[in-house]
């Protein structure tokens, strides 16, 4: 998605055991094989990852990582080291939720992209409370932690660390499909890498993602919307 939305160069860090398959599948991006354990990136890859972070304009971490101690160590190391914006999605969110202190040593701009369940893990709040108090919950989390927050759901809410909020009007229930969040995360990373303010870039990405979902719904029918079709329909 980052390539589709304008990134000139995208590098995908993958477990070495999966590198050949990913090279064959992703023709538009470069892959970097990393030391792994049981098919997941291991803590032994941290030095190589940080070298790559030095060369990046933006880092997206989380999609497909899985949940284990090594992954948590990788995520925490990237947060502590990075000087460029870091987008934390999927299993990256789970890793931070297990150790919120990881944010205290972080000096780079951070963007979280949780859905309600992930937001519950981050905050310790009940899902029902979050769903009934989305604006307040998002604002408090963003301000208290000094981050940008994309709280996904019906009318996704984007909140900046200063409390500024945007409510998105695009999108439909067809976007609640596997991989759709990864499409959004890649779009956020692409726009942030251009130097656009993190909150504005996040709001733009959410709007584009929702609009692509609406185009896909009109083209294929809501029951047939998939992540790949959403990416295909990005205007």
Predicted feature residues:
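Small-residue (G/A/S/T)-rich helix-start motifs and N-terminal tracts that mark the onset
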Residues: 1-87, 94-111, 116-235
